[in-house]
Amino acid sequence: MPLLDSFTVDHTIMNAPAVRIAKTMQTPSKDTITVFDLRFTVPNEDLLSEKGIHTLEHLYAGFMRNHLNSPDVEIIDISPMGCRTGFYMSLIGSPSETEVANAWLAAMRDVLAVEHQEEIPELNKYQCGTYAMHSLAEAKTIAQAVIDAGVGTNKNADITLSDEQLKQL
């Protein structure tokens, strides 16, 4: 089985909250696709609550688009990681980590401004596979933790596992 890019970095030395450019690629029409690792919590130390991450999934994707989309950037998708330590964001374009971090913080402030659970987009049985599994309070706790900590960066050059390390694992 091929080794996925996300498993070539050392999760024991990742910082969080932090932005990492996980991958860039070119489409046949020469558009740049960038995949970001938006790490909310330190791997293997903490994880996002299931209701909190689900509510963030509904809110964060829209708020990030409000703050990051531009004539040069278009978010394709923002999806939670299975390990519940963050989200992956795929987009057309190549914004800097600083631009992404600033949009992330603005999106977290937007989460804090949501007053009622009923304001969560697509919160119904027709548009959500587990519409009862939400918590605005838990999403706000996550958002406040990100704001309080600030958003840094993880650089691949600093956290990539060597070929020798990968062989030993």
Curated annotation (Swiss-Prot):
Involved in the synthesis of autoinducer 2 (AI-2) which is secreted by bacteria and is used to communicate both the cell density and the metabolic potential of the environment. The regulation of gene expression in response to changes in cell density is called quorum sensing. Catalyzes the transformation of S-ribosylhomocysteine (RHC) to homocysteine (HC) and 4,5-dihydroxy-2,3-pentadione (DPD). InterPro entries: LuxS_sf (IPR037005), Metalloenz_LuxS/M16 (IPR011249), S-ribosylhomocysteinase (IPR003815). One of its GO terms (biological process) is quorum sensing. Its EC number is 4.4.1.21. It comes from Psychromonas ingrahamii (strain DSM 17664 / CCUG 51855 / 37). It catalyses: S-(5-deoxy-D-ribos-5-yl)-L-homocysteine = (S)-4,5-dihydroxypentane-2,3-dione + L-homocysteine. The gene is luxS. SUPFAM superfamilies: LuxS/MPP-like metallohydrolase (SSF63411). The keyword Transmembrane helix does not apply. Keywords: Autoinducer synthesis, Iron, Lyase, Metal-binding, Quorum sensing. Belongs to the LuxS family. The keyword Lyase applies. Its cofactor is Fe cation. HAMAP family: LuxS. One of its GO terms (molecular function) is iron ion binding. This is S-ribosylhomocysteine lyase. Fe cation binds at H54, H58, C128.
